[in-house]
Amino acid sequence: MVIKAQSPAGFAEEYIIESIWNNRFPPGSILPAERELSELIGVTRTTLREVLQRLARDGWLTIQHGKPTKVNNFWETSGLNILETLARLDHDSVPQLIDNLLAVRTNIATIFVRTAIRHHPEKAQEILARAKTVDDNAEAFTALDYGIFRGLAFASGNPIYGLILNGLKGLYTRVGRYYFSNPEARKLALTFYNKLSTLCDTESYDQVLECLRTYGKESGAIWHSMQGTMPSDLAEARR
């Protein structure tokens, strides 16, 4: 087990999460008593208690007063906020995890983008206009792309779509910095944003779905062509 965390709390958190992932503390099992676990990890009981509370909020554990702490099946109890952690724990699964991430984005975007353009065209155009002034680099395009999708999600009038995008931000941003390092990816994205703007201007709402699906396929092809040179630390968490 290689743990890169620098603080005692960060170390304890990574130790417990990796132990759950590697079935040292399997789902459904009971964690060791607080004193035993703090000695095992090498942190104070106060630090451990704070970490356990945080992991419980993220769905890894169930803490009940007067009862032992139980390890959850995190696939059933956690939210989107653990995506980065999963990518860091299992590098081999990162390509599939990212494919799933992009598929989810495309699928839900077909709903909220069309709704935003149809019912709130002025707001949608304001969001899409950001593409006119973006700097031609990966960092700027990553922020722009996330900002446009998130902005249109909230502009749809259903804030739940925006909250979903909020949950995807961490891994989305890491993937974007690598994906948009490719000039072809940046060029394709600009074409896509301009197309959406045109559809908004012409009230061609029925074409939004096909526009999104086409962009999903074309951007997916670029992404797959880049997977062979994907850096191994793409999903490394900052601590």
From Swiss-Prot:
Residues 6-74 form the HTH gntR-type domain. It holds the Pfam family FadR_C. One of its GO terms (cellular component) is cytoplasm. It is found in: Cytoplasm. Its main location: cytoplasm. The keyword Transcription regulation applies. Multifunctional regulator of fatty acid metabolism. Represses transcription of at least eight genes required for fatty acid transport and beta-oxidation including fadA, fadB, fadD, fadL and fadE. Activates transcription of at least three genes required for unsaturated fatty acid biosynthesis: fabA, fabB and iclR, the gene encoding the transcriptional regulator of the aceBAK operon encoding the glyoxylate shunt enzymes. Binding of FadR is specifically inhibited by long chain fatty acyl-CoA compounds. InterPro entries: FA-response_TF_FadR, FadR_C, TF_FadR/GntR_C, Tscrpt_reg_HTH_GntR, WH-like_DNA-bd_sf, WH_DNA-bd_sf. NCBIfam families: fadR_gamma, PRK04984.1. Homodimer. It comes from Yersinia pestis. The keyword Cell cycle does not apply. This is Fatty acid metabolism regulator protein. Disulfide bonds: none annotated. Keywords: Activator, Cytoplasm, DNA-binding, Fatty acid metabolism, Lipid metabolism, Repressor, Transcription, Transcription regulation. One of its GO terms (biological process) is fatty acid metabolic process. Residues 34-53 bind DNA. It comes from the Bacteria. GO terms for molecular function: DNA binding; DNA-binding transcription factor activity; fatty-acyl-CoA binding.
